[in-house]
Amino acid sequence: MGRKWNNIKEKKASKDANTSRIYAKFGREIYVAARQGEPDPELNQALKAVLERAKTYNVPKSIIDRAIEKAKGGSDESYEERRYEGFGPNGAMVIVDALTNNVNRTASDVRAAFGKNGGNMGVSGSVAYMFDRVAVIGFEGKTADEALEILMDADVDAKDIIEEDDTVIVYAEPDQFHAVQEAFRNAGIEEFSVAEFSMIAHNEVTLSEDVQAQFEKMIDAIEDLEDVQQVYHNVDLA
């Protein structure tokens, strides 16, 4: 199960190295999570999960604090969660999650990013049934067998555990996100390189070099949109 998480994170880090784009996206997501519940992560599981993910991207504390204070301050700025589904070259499947304060603008922008790069936006439900939502936790310092033993001792279930380079990647049901992290923290793991909720495709597809280049250009165009928070797909980019 899964994708090359280290490769994905390295690509994102390289892409965002000279911009504040990723911080702006996290700022928005943190604000929305804090506004929808308590601004205290210990009392708000959604906010806690966003903050755990933000740590893996080294989001500055100032960005996090500003977003939470904005939510505390009673800002009337509101965002809606929207999911768009579509197809890339050769029928590759794509899911786009967005937070927007203008649904018409975002839908138009996402549709254009698909259309200008060899893809097309589909209707709701056209591809999501081919993906499963999972929690993904990654860390160094243990083997897959050791990770399994830790989870078994803590009575926490995992869907799959793999080793990728020097990193152990654990896939679990979404409602086990915090339980998995807590089990490993109790076993001495202090830092996580991956802490995500993801949509994992049932089956991945491989594209030819030229088609893959076009597909990656399309994904980049979608990810560059201000309102887009996450993009998932079923293409093996290894």
From Swiss-Prot:
UniProt-annotated location(s): Cytoplasm
InterPro entries named among the record's database cross-references: Integrase-like_N, TACO1_YebC-like_2nd/3rd_dom, TACO1_YebC_N, Transcrip_reg_TACO1-like, Transcrip_reg_TACO1-like_dom3, Transcrip_reg_TACO1_YeeN, YebC-like
Chief location: cytoplasm
CC terms in the record's Gene Ontology section: cytosol
UniProt keyword annotations, A-Z: Cytoplasm, DNA-binding, Transcription, Transcription regulation
One GO term of the biological process aspect: regulation of DNA-templated transcription
Entry-linked SUPFAM superfamilies: YebC-like
Matches recorded under Pfam families: TACO1_YebC_N, Transcrip_reg
GO molecular function terms listed in the Swiss-Prot or TrEMBL record: DNA binding
Family indicated by similarity: Belongs to the TACO1 family. YeeN subfamily.
Official protein name in the record: Probable transcriptional regulatory protein ABC1956
